[in-house]
């Protein structure tokens, strides 16, 4: 479980991250990261989008739990005030935990590299 202050809940936060943040996609996942320099004292916040295309409720919740456990390890490395949205593709329903972790690692490295470059 992610800490309460690290969870993204408001629709407006999701919209801002998706519209203004950097995007990186792979076969199983797409990530959107927005680093906001003005909110450095706030913790990074993470939200998950797992649509009905992924599967029924049990499958969607399973994918969301897996992603949450993987993303928890990235929280300390994210800049303060950043917004991260992780969107699962339908293939994520049948993927192994290791495959999800590997793809998320690639997505995160791409996103962080793009955002750090944009801040310079």
Describe the role of every protein-language-model region.
Residues 1-120:
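Positively charged, solvent-exposed patches that mediate nucleic-acid binding
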